[in-house]
């Protein structure tokens, strides 16, 4: 079974989502189904069908999270050898060498990736180019719109 790399905060987020789904969403949906059943004929009961559809979605998500939690490889970046190398979990400051713009990314697992929050998947082209390199080095990212060159300004183990 393949392990899934994730940061400590990413694992906590999944655990919190699982608790919310089990403790809040599941009971609410069961109640919605019971209420909809009281309205009579189930064949034409839109509320009942909507609640059953939502139940299927929530149960599927619960199973997905439970499966992932059993395969997580939780990586506490603060415990890693802080040698200035870009590795999973590090926060990396970059200088785009074509336009001198600076950007900061944290390299995280698939479930944590959120480009708007500066969190990029460890499988993304940028992360793959950065991994193993260190402060002061230049990397080339093979992006869909062409190659982009970056200088690694700083690597933080937050």
Could you say what each language-model-derived stretch is?
Residues 59-73:
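Amphipathic alpha-helical coiled-coil segments
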Residues 1, 16, 37, 43, ...:
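Residue-level signal for pocket-adjacent positions within structured domains
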Residues 1-63:
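N-terminal cationic and glycine-rich segments that engage phosphates or anionic surfaces
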Residues 18, 22-25, 69-73, 134:
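Conserved NTP-handling cores and scaffolds of large molecular machines
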Residues 75-157:
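Non-DNA-binding regulatory cores of transcription-related proteins
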Residues 12, 22, 43, 52, ...:
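Context-gated lysine
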């Amino acid at each position: 079974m393949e392990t899934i790399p994730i940061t400590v905060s990413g694992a906590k987020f999944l655990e919190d989502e699982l608790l919310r789904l089990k403790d809040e969403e599941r009971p609410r949906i069961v109640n919605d189904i019971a209420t909809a059943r009281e309205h009579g004929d189930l064949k034409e009961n839109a509320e009942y069908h909507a609640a059953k559809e939502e139940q299927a979605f929530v149960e599927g998500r619960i199973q997905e999270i439970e499966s992932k939690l059993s395969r997580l490889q939780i990586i506490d970046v603060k415990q890693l050898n802080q040698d200035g190398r870009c590795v999973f979990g590090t926060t990396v400051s970059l200088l785009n060498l074509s336009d001198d713009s600076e950007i900061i990314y944290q390299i995280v697992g698939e479930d944590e990736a959120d480009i708007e929050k500066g969190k990029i998947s460890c499988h993304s082209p940028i992360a793959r180019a950065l991994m193993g390199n260190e402060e002061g080095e230049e990397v080339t990212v093979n992006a869909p719109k062409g190659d982009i060159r970056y200088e690694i300004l700083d690597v933080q183990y937050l």
